[in-house]
Amino acid sequence: MDYKTSGVDIEAGYRSVELMKKYVKETMRPEVLGGLGGFSGAFSLAKIKEMEEPVLLSGTDGCGTKVKLAMVMDKHDTIGIDAVAMCVNDIACAGGEPLFFLDYIACGKNYPEKIASIVKGVAEGCKQSDAALIGGETAEHPGLMPEDEYDLAGFAVGVCDKKEMITGEELKAGDVLIGMASTGVHSNGFSLVRKVFDMTKESLDTYYEELGTTLGEALLAPTRIYVKALKSIKNAGVRVHACSHITGGGFYENIPRMLKEGTRAVVEKNSYPVLPIFKLLAEKGNIDEQMMYNTYNMGLGMILAVDAADVDKTMEAIKAAGDTPYVVGRIEDGEKGVTLC
């Protein structure tokens, strides 16, 4: 008996590494030390000496059950963008610049082309956020997972000068809330999505006029990465007072996380367009509005607060980065929380 007989194909592992190398190399930054295949990834911190008090920021996350959708559609080259986005967006909304990323793939069986396709998406997410993909792991789990299934997670590290961290402490009544458009459902709430829609290939290939695409393509749209937008805002000289990445828990859970005691966020629901995928999901699943806002981003993947005098500069900076901004509300004095009106 050998290792392959037990379900672990070492040669397939070697093959997948060879196939993914070209994608990984596209993410390299000058600070990356050494080549691929080492026992650890190395990244020089020489540049951060310019900062007064450098702070490392970290984030780890996965794509939830969105990976199941990728499996059914047999489309694996974008799910990696989601894994990166979920980590680097968290770092960015704290004021950080992503430095590097590591991915972890667990699979029932290593199919080299599929694994390389997943890593292609991870590399694309890294390029969008200017993070180097300096390491990763593909773990074959025979007997623990079905052969055609996998899960994907990642870990990111970023940096910022402590004085430039976005903490919410500068938040005050009169600040304006600006939301940045999402691409769709992003990477949370897919367990509910899978209860509402028939997750067969035939159903996912169904074209919906209101979506302008198939159901599967709309649901699989990669999570938008907001790193460049926040960097553009910073370069415009705007001080962001608070920032929230709208993920699991929607508006009601995530917006309060950016508030300090004694401040309340007021969001005007009609100030921006709710994406068609959310309207379809609510209709097909008979989901009430409060549950939708308590679960999904509803078309806004990130919400930030700035001084009223900085609104125009912030809007222009976001547009310059290729994102779509909306003035969606304000900060008031009051009990910490969020009001949707």
PLM features: residue spans?
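Buried hydrophobic packing segments
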Residues: 20, 42, 87-88, 193-196, ...
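Glycine-rich phosphate/pyrophosphate-binding loop regions near the starts of catalytic domains
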Residues: 22, 28-183
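Acidic, glycine-rich loop-and-beta core segments that form the ion-binding/anion-interacting portion
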Residues: 173-217
